[in-house]
Amino acid sequence: MTQRTLRGTNRRRIRVSGFRARMRTASGRQVLRRRRAKGRYRLAVS
């Protein structure tokens, strides 16, 4: 039987790649800027 090797947790997902996490750093804000420029419907996971 195969095993589930990846079990993501929502808390970590939000902490690492949520909107507020992106806003916290300069490079994160750059990510948001790029995604806005590209016209993404969702800027960050949250």
UniProtKB/Swiss-Prot annotation:
**GO CC, alphabetical:** ribonucleoprotein complex; ribosome
* Record-linked Pfam families: Ribosomal_L34
The record's region (Disordered) falls at 25-46
Q: Which GO terms describe its molecular function?
A: structural constituent of ribosome
- Where do Basic residues bias regions lie? 31-46
Question: Could you give a single Gene Ontology term from the biological process aspect?
Answer: translation
Recorded hits in InterPro entries, A to Z, give:
Ribosomal_bL34
Its keywords, alphabetically, are: Ribonucleoprotein, Ribosomal protein
HAMAP family from the xrefs?
A: Ribosomal_bL34 (MF_00391)
Q: Please give the family membership noted in the entry.
A: Belongs to the bacterial ribosomal protein bL34 family.
Please give the name of this protein.
Large ribosomal subunit protein bL34
Q: In which organism is this protein found?
A: Synechococcus sp. (strain JA-3-3Ab)
Query: In the UniProt record, what gene is named as encoding this protein?
Result: rpmH
